[in-house]
């Protein structure tokens, strides 16, 4: 997919800068506590779009008993994550391409600010791929924007963003039979109330 490849190249080129400006590993601390209470105590969890390991401190602290696996489409991000957390498992993976995903069944998933980079016409494939690698009835976490979330001037940002309304997001989750357990509005770096986070349960 052209859009995903363009986004990958962006992160491979600008990943170091992105990592150094996205430093709040605990921005999602409150929902993470909820997730840990829903996931099996020693469950295997996949972090989809792990970047340079920005959310790993949550897993090493609050979720320290969980078995962590991080995937990302960017080689640079995987290199950074592996350097920072050599005791954990990271690998290249594209959530829209099942052939690149781990051949495991996970007890839950974490997908913060990543599903938006896949064009909407490929969401059915992407969501099916998530279902294939996670156990039935497992819980997951996703964040999606309702407006463009980037602090970069939009015409200078070549990454793909799928922007749909909150109602459209919820309708899509319902169409997939993903049960909505929690929904909260979050501020972005440069825009208020831009993010919706969802804790979901798969069918």
Residue spans for each PLM region:
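Class I (Rossmann-like) S-adenosyl-L-methionine-dependent methyltransferase catalytic domain
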Residues: 1-46, 51-102, 121-125, 129, ...
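A conserved beta-strand element that flanks and buttresses the S-adenosyl-L-methionine
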Residues: 110
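Short catalytic micro-motifs in class I SAM-dependent methyltransferases
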Residues: 113-117
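Helix-to-beta-strand junctions that scaffold the AdoMet/dcAdoMet cofactor pocket
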Residues: 118-120, 134-136
